[in-house]
């Protein structure tokens, strides 16, 4: 549907949404049968409060959403309280080493994708090529079964808008790893190509220690992995050791392990033959942090997400293909409250992404989120009880925090930065399934207006420079001092530093900040890395190894110059992550 021009700002839609980015995005598939944004927010708030048997919470939930404090994941906004889909559309399934389970998981994936699911698939248990099988034959390995899943996901529609999406997870030490690494390349035997699957390499501590010790096989596998990431952006990486060492008490007491991640790499939950994880997500808006930091927003958001999960359980129960997902959701009730607008928050306060002030802000915000989410889960346990995997912990949920990419959510939140990621460019054109936009960094635009240089000439110059302001001479000599714009104040932060783009930020600084953040996140973070095309392999290797050493659980895309130009910056992010765009 198109935007209804009769809708009134502040009545039918929030005042902060009075911009083309918000209007085109929310009217691009999120609203049902002509409902206004306000009616959509009401639908969601009412439904979730009802699932909690707490109708008095409806108004509180609605206010958080209306103010732009709580930003709903795409399926939560689109489907909660409707009969057109489920409020969760991101799943993870693990495949056992038998033809029966390989086939059953293919059916499960097909049925999940039919209902709008993006699916992570773990194939590490499948025996390698050349291994013996029943009947005196030998296995053809993992790759042909990836082809089966590739064909299934391509053939299965997600609603009427987009095709199914899936990622395949395999251990870097699996004997088929080298061949698996090439399945997305359109060359060789077409029956061994999987052009529609995404990939994730699962990397353990044992492997990383062998790599550090100079083991030739480990170095060869790691080198190929990084070469492929530089060339294509993938595979993602799951540091399995970091993940399982940090598992919550509920997992440790039940001997539950993480073997894989989801299609956007922020979910690290247990999977096996009978348990498939679900991604129950939404985000708090850091652009409005000063408005809500002394409120109950984070606490209420966990109540909200627990209600969303209950909506999923009740609607999915009894549906063929959802048995493993419902079973996992009921036993663990894992949630993933994240954030959107981190870089916007820093820029609004005149803080450079690199440096101590950003680190202090990281600790301030994410420690608060950790405390408040756990307080909420304890209150939920007192009210509704502990699920099976949480018995004895005093908690309602095994997990509470995960930071998704939030690409669409950044638009639905008033044109702010996505997740915890730096802006790829300060201005760019973006073509998505939800519309075409010219997106300008609104915090930079405020500065340019104040300096009376918010002109087409300046923006054209920034666009020509790939979204960078480093060659804008009019910004020379301007600084931020305690968040205020000043002239020739060399003890302050240069404006150009504050508005550095992704590739201009030292990636070791980004990883260091991510390591601080990871200490407060019990799931994972969709963490991209960005390098110039001429970045030396030694530097790329150093950053990746440092990510492992800092305890980071997952790495998402590795972006290079080809996907960082200002005019195509938005295409660097996987569009299929609408599945879990929290």
Placement of each model-derived feature along the sequence:
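Conserved, charged catalytic cores of large soluble enzymes
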Residues: 1-58, 135-148, 158-256, 339-387, ...
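Function-dense linear segments that define catalytic or interfacial modules
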Residues: 27-33, 45-54, 62-134, 142, ...
């Amino acid at each position: 549907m198109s935007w209804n021009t009769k809708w009134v700002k502040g009545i039918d839609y929030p005042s902060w949404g009075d911009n083309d980015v918000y209007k085109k995005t929310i009217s691009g598939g999120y609203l049902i049968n002509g409902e206004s944004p306000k009616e959509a927010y009401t639908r969601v708030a009412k439904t979730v409060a009802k699932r909690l048997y707490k109708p008095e919470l409806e108004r509180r939930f609605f206010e958080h959403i209306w103010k732009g404090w709580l930003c709903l994941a795409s399926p939560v906004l689109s489907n909660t309280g409707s009969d057109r889909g489920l409020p969760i559309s991101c799943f993870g399934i693990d495949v056992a080493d038998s033809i029966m389970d390989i086939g059953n998981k293919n059916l499960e994936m097909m049925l999940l994708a039919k209902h709008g699911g993006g699916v992570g698939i773990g194939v590490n248990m499948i025996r390698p090529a050349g291994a013996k099988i029943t009947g005196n034959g030998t296995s053809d390995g993992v790759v042909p079964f990836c082809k089966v899943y590739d064909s299934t996901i391509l053939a299965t529609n997600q609603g009427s808008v987009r095709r199914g999406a899936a990622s395949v997870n395999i251990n870097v030490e699996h004997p088929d790893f080298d061949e698996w690494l090439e399945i997305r390349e359109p060359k060789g035997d077409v029956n061994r190509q999987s052009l529609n699957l995404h990939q994730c390499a699962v990397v353990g501590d044992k492997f990383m220690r062998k790599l550090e010790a100079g083991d030739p096989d480990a170095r060869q596998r790691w080198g190929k992995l990084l070469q492929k990431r530089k060339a294509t952006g993938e595979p993602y990486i799951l540091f399995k050791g970091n993940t399982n060492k940090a598992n919550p008490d509920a997992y440790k007491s039940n001997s539950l392990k993480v073997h894989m991640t989801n299609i956007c790499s922020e979910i690290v939950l247990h999977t096996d033959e009978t348990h498939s994880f679900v991604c129950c997500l939404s985000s708090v808006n850091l652009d409005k942090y000063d408005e809500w930091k002394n409120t109950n927003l984070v606490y209420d958001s966990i109540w909200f997400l627990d209600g969303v999960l209950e909506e999923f359980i009740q609607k999915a129960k009894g549906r063929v293909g959802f048995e493993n997902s419902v079973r996992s959701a009921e036993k663990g009730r894992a949630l993933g409250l994240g954030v959107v607008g981190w870089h916007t928050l820093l820029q609004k306060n005149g803080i450079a992404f690199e440096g101590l002030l950003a680190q202090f802000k990281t600790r301030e915000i994410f420690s608060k989120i950790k405390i408040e989410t756990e307080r909420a889960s304890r209150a939920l346990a007192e009210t509704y009880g502990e699920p099976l995997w949480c018995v004895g912990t005093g908690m309602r949920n095994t997990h509470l925090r995960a930071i998704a990419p939030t690409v669409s959510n950044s638009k639905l939140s008033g044109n702010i930065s996505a997740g915890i990621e730096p802006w790829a460019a300060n201005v760019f054109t973006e073509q998505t399934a939800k519309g075409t936009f010219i997106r300008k960094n609104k915090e930079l635009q405020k500065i340019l207006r104040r300096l009376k240089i918010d002109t087409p000439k300046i923006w054209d110059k920034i666009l020509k420079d790939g979204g960078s302001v480093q060659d804008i001479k009019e910004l020379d000599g301007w600084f931020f001092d305690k968040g205020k714009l000043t002239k020739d104040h060399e003890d302050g932060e240069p404006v150009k530093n504050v508005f550095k783009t992704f590739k201009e930020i030292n990636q070791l600084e980004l990883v260091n900040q991510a390591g601080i953040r990871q200490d407060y996140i019990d799931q994972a973070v969709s963490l991209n890395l960005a390098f110039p095309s001429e970045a030396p392999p030694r530097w790329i290797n150093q950053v990746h190894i440092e990510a492992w050493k800092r305890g980071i659980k997952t790495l998402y895309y590795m972006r290079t110059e080809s996907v960082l130009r200002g005019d195509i910056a938005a295409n660097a992010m996987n569009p299929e992550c609408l599945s879990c765009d929290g």
